[in-house]
Amino acid sequence: MPYVDRQNRICGFLDIEENENSGKFLRRYFILDTREDSFVWYMDNPQNLPSGSSRVGAIKLTYISKVSDATKLRPKAEFCFVMNAGMRKYFLQANDQQDLVEWVNVLNKAIKITVPKQSDSQPNSDNLSRHGECGKKQVSYRTDIVGGVPIITPTQKEEVNECGESIDRNNLKRSQSHLPYFTPKPPQDSAVIKAGYCVKQGAVMKNWKRRYFQLDENTIGYFKSELEKEPLRVIPLKEVHKVQECKQSDIMMRDNLFEIVTTSRTFYVQADSPEEMHSWIKAVSGAIVAQRGPGRSASSEHPPGPSESKHAFRPTNAATATSHSTASRSNSLVSTFTMEKRGFYESLAKVKPGNFKVQTVSPREPASKVTEQALLRPQSKNGPQEKDCDLVDLDDASLPVSDV
């Protein structure tokens, strides 16, 4: 289906019989440009072709006299129509019936507009900028589509009117941002590191347009063409985080694709070849490193400060204090255990045989707890005694003897 691109040209794919009467139709990409008064075709979309690829064929619209349906002339070719251009007939084949009708209509409309008509007393819409009344300003408008938004800018035509009088000098004043395409670019303050054409994806419409990129020491910008003075956009290198080969190139169906990642947006740019892609990545990365310096990218290591050393010694001091307290507590427990042991044996010496009672351990209490309770339990000076116990005979041989 024919569609209108950003330059207001009608584009689309058709099959054309390039060799007359051969009956062989080849797939080509057609562009109908009424401003250039031409109908040209390429092997593929020029955006997908390498830079400098030439067109396959072209016809001036002024040479086309009529465009009509040719299904009866070529019954074997479906949806066929014919263009009568001079001494030759060009047969083309559309995709379907609706595609055929639309191409025939737009071509007939184009040749009606572009063919000059001397008998017309009133200028048509296409020639309003060329013909005007004597003594009046001739104002034309230029439409640019930037980021999917149409921008209409009034411009002045540098020409002489039909009455032979030169246009007023006020008409020759131009805005500095809207100079003609043939104006050469002035010398830049920063040296240009790399420049060339690449294909870029739009931010809003997500379509791909061929732009002229230019990299200098501080920025990377892209222009509509190499003859433009003002760039469509300038990206400061300080906002660029990284430049790398795009990992989504297979998803986007684009070869030689790399991405420029910034703070607000990721720019997808397609180069003409893998070598050109790597050259752009290397050039932009080198410019970023040269601007920021290698010191910023390297991570600096700081030695530990006095506060860190102070904290580092705290665990050692705490461990030392803990060990001292544990040792003192162990010595205290050993002393207590020794004293209690002596008291225990002294009490046994005063107890009658058969009256000695052993402490029972509860199944719910651990042995360590019972031992600690036994050690810490205060005892009388003479040891535990019962009320009904008799006097102990110290000469009894059955009494236990302790070596104290």
Swiss-Prot record:
Residue ranges of every copy of the PH domain listed in the record: 7-112, 191-289
Highest taxon of source: Eukaryota
GO terms, molecular function: PDZ domain binding; phosphatidylinositol-3,4-bisphosphate binding; phospholipid binding
Gene3D superfamilies in alphabetical order: Pleckstrin-homology domain (PH domain)/Phosphotyrosine-binding domain (PTB)
Pfam families tied to this protein: PH
Region ranges (Disordered): 291-332, 355-404
Coiled coil: none
Places the protein is found: Cytoplasm; Cell membrane; Nucleus
Record keywords, A-Z: Cell membrane, Cytoplasm, Lipid-binding, Membrane, Nucleus, Phosphoprotein, Repeat
Low complexity biased stretches: 316-332
Protein name per Swiss-Prot or TrEMBL: Pleckstrin homology domain-containing family A member 1
Organism whose genome encodes this protein: Homo sapiens
